Amino acid sequence: MAALAALAKKVWSARRLLVLLLVPLALLPILFALPPKEGRCLYVILLMAVYWCTEALPLSVTALLPIILFPFMGILPSSKVCPQYFLDTNFLFLSGLIMASAIEEWNLHRRIALKVLMLVGVQPARLILGMMVTTSFLSMWLSNTASTAMMLPIASAILKSLFGQREARKDLPREGDESTAAVQGNGLRTVPTEMQFLASSEGGHTEDAEAPMELPDDSKEEEHRRNIWKGFLISIPYSASIGGTATLTGTAPNLILLGQLKSFFPQCDVVNFGSWFIFAFPLMLLFLLVGWLWISFLYGGMSWRSWRKKKSKIRADAEDQAKAVIQEEFQNLGPIKFAEQAVFILFCTFAILLFSRDPKFIPGWASLFAPGFVSDAVTGVAIVTILFFFPSQKPSLKWWFDFKAPNSETEPLLSWKKAQETVPWNIILLLGGGFAMAKGCEESGLSAWIGGQLHPLEHVPPLLAVLLITVVIAFFTEFASNTATIIIFLPVLAELAIRLHVHPLYLMIPGTVGCSYAFMLPVSTPPNSIAFSTGHLLVKDMVRTGLLMNLMGVLLLSLAMNTWAQTIFQLGTFPDWANTHAANATALPPALTNNTVQTF
């Protein structure tokens, strides 16, 4: 028995190597079960899917496999594979990451967060709302992981003032954890990017969370404090995941949708920064509202009894202390600097230009140029380029005439060294791997083959299809990276839409947004893992809270797709650009020639 246990431990320690060696052998029958080229492409895709789900290789390294396997297996020449890693979609995402680096470099996000918390008040339910609103807003522009890691130390400082040091002694992961490498100094420093966290998770060394602390069960006040603490911690990663869906640059799956749309449907131009924001921002607000109500009621921050009950002096004093802490931290930032003002103006310009380039409901500024020449990537790169030469100190004309003034070079708002350190370049490779995979599916004919296998689903009502897709993907992404999940599912959803003869976006958007709705497990997303690693949450806390969050997300997404999304993306018709793809890729039955479809 001891020998068997020892052998099991050795197998577990070598599990990644075993997956690397055995999975390619296990998938070999696929090469003989399908037509040659389609079979080879499916072999590569399934191999990458298993490697992504098991993290046998780092995610970004797995994303590079098409560069090796597609040419060797005769699927795509290298000249067609490599450009997929630097499409204009990748540069749009890169520009967003660089802008986020500048915001974090000058602590602009921290100033915004503290100011919002000062405005919402210090009652627990209001603070939870403030945390969720602030985190979601930051997550629209920063990475979800960075937003979470920045807000958790702020929440910790507030909770220390509310409940004292005894309950706050394990408020953050242990010093030295890579997932919180930049939570330094006064406990309120932010993690600049998700790069360190992803690196640690890809390496396979995820620290076990400490056991939650023991608190006396005989005290209702202690139970109230424990629940408030959990409510704070759990609301931050959830709102980060929700907020990331509101903009195209907010999370990688949104940009993967844009890139794969251009691959499968080159004539599709309905999705851009502006149209996506008009669709996703109201959905984000609705989800934040119902999520806040659910978390507040579940963890005691808000209840009918608390509204009627007079506040105790202890709680009133604690709230006053929390308010003082927030104000003190805000004052410690000092007066707003010239660099902060400059970054804020450039950030606003960045967002406004992206939104107004081609908002669809009115002509955008891109109409002043030749059609198709100016994309969102052009806008993003143009703005972030300014960061590398615009001075961080206020320029002065007197300097030119004062010959005694020091002749030191003015530092720019962002240095390239800082950008190199903080931008998660691995995500760029991951995006490229998804686009290369989509290109391989199209060129090899695998997309057409998948479409043929989906023939039995042609009679599924589209509304039911949306619900099923969102549920399946939301469940799948609880156990796998949301980026890997959407890379795998989007080609299938595109072909399913052709078979159902519905607008492709009617299925592809729910799949994309749904893969961000991962709330039930610590391993589902890096933000969940960071919150769980504080040691104050149990898995059952996340399952209990996240189950209803997932359900609410699915229902709200279905509501959005069948109401305002119909108008924004013209989902009630089967577009010509999809019809062209259908004619080239799959032979639709004669009965499916009507150009209008009812989606609900």
UniProtKB/Swiss-Prot annotation:
Do you know which CDD domains this protein is assigned to? SLC13_permease (cd01115)
Task: Give the matching Pfam families.
Answer: Na_sulph_symp (PF00939)
Q: How does it sit in the membrane?
A: Multi-pass membrane protein
Residues carrying sugar: 584, 594
Q: Mind naming one GO cellular-component term on file for this protein?
A: basolateral plasma membrane
TM ranges: 17-37, 56-76, 83-103, 138-158, 230-250, 279-299, 337-357, 373-393, 462-482, 506-526, 547-567
Q: Which reaction does it catalyse?
A: succinate(out) + 3 Na(+)(out) = succinate(in) + 3 Na(+)(in); 2-oxoglutarate(out) + 3 Na(+)(out) = 2-oxoglutarate(in) + 3 Na(+)(in); N-acetyl-L-aspartate(out) + 3 Na(+)(out) = N-acetyl-L-aspartate(in) + 3 Na(+)(in); fumarate(out) + 3 Na(+)(out) = fumarate(in) + 3 Na(+)(in)
Any one GO biological process: succinate transmembrane transport
Please list the tissues where expression of this protein has been recorded.
Highly expressed in kidney, and at much lower levels in brain.
Q: Which family does it belong to?
A: Belongs to the SLC13A/DASS transporter (TC 2.A.47) family. NADC subfamily.
Q: Which domain of life is it from?
A: Eukaryota
Q: What is this protein called?
A: Na(+)/dicarboxylate cotransporter 3
Q: Which residues lie within the membrane without crossing it?
A: 423-443
- What GO molecular function terms would the record report? alpha-ketoglutarate transmembrane transporter activity; amide transmembrane transporter activity; dicarboxylic acid transmembrane transporter activity; glutathione transmembrane transporter activity; high-affinity sodium:dicarboxylate symporter activity; modified amino acid transmembrane transporter activity; organic acid:sodium symporter activity; succinate transmembrane transporter activity
Ranges of the Extracellular topological domain: 38-55, 104-137, 251-278, 358-372, 483-505, 568-600
Q: What does this protein do?
A: High-affinity sodium-dicarboxylate cotransporter that accepts a range of substrates with 4-6 carbon atoms, such as the citric acid cycle intermediates succinate and alpha-ketoglutarate (2-oxoglutarate), as well as other compounds including N-acetyl-L-aspartate. Transports the dicarboxylate into the cell with a probable stoichiometry of 3 Na(+) for 1 divalent dicarboxylate, rendering the process electrogenic. Can transport citrate in a Na(+)-dependent manner, recognizing the divalent form of citrate rather than the trivalent form which is normally found in blood.
Gene symbol of the encoding locus: Slc13a3
Source organism per entry reads Mus musculus (Mouse)
Can you say where in the cell this protein is located? Cell membrane
Keywords attached to this Swiss-Prot or TrEMBL record, sorted alphabetically, are:
Cell membrane, Glycoprotein, Ion transport, Membrane, Sodium, Sodium transport, Symport, Transmembrane, Transmembrane helix, Transport
The segments annotated as topological domain Cytoplasmic are 1-16, 77-82, 159-229, 300-336, 394-422, 444-461, 527-546
